[in-house]
A protein has these predicted regions:
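C-terminal structural segment of proteins
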Residues: 1-121
Length: 121
């Protein structure tokens, strides 16, 4: 699948998504866009619960991805600044009229750092 495409078949419809409640979790969603109502050029989501940290990125590849290098760095005691430098590792961001590949990589690092700091990671 590509950008703005789904893996659903022609005769399938997504009707529900269930996520477990994380009562003791902290989280942050950071996005960069031109105007508030625009799609994110790059977005970073961070969630933490009882020592576990999850990081996801949007618009850094053909589909949303987990930044597992960042998660592992946090798990091993790296600071938010150190871990966020790994945010774009392994990504193949699109280059389009909104942003080039290098700029998207820069945004991923900055937004991930902000998210880690805001969520207390």
């Amino acid at each position: 699948t590509g950008f703005l495409e789904t893996d659903l078949g022609e005769d399938e419809m997504l009707v529900e998504v269930r996520l477990p409640k994380l009562p003791d979790s902290t989280w942050s969603f950071q996005k960069f866009n031109r105007r508030a109502q625009d799609w994110a050029i790059v977005g970073s989501a961070v969630v933490g619960d009882q020592g576990i940290c999850g990081v996801g990125l949007v618009n850094m590849d053909s589909r949303p991805i987990r930044a597992t290098a960042v998660e592992e760095a946090i798990k091993n005691g790296s600071s938010a600044a150190e871990a966020s430098e790994l945010a774009a590792d392994g990504c193949e961001p699109p280059a389009d009229i909104n942003a080039g590949m290098d700029y998207r990589r820069h945004l991923a690092r900055v937004l991930t750092r902000r998210g880690l700091e805001e969520s207390g990671r």
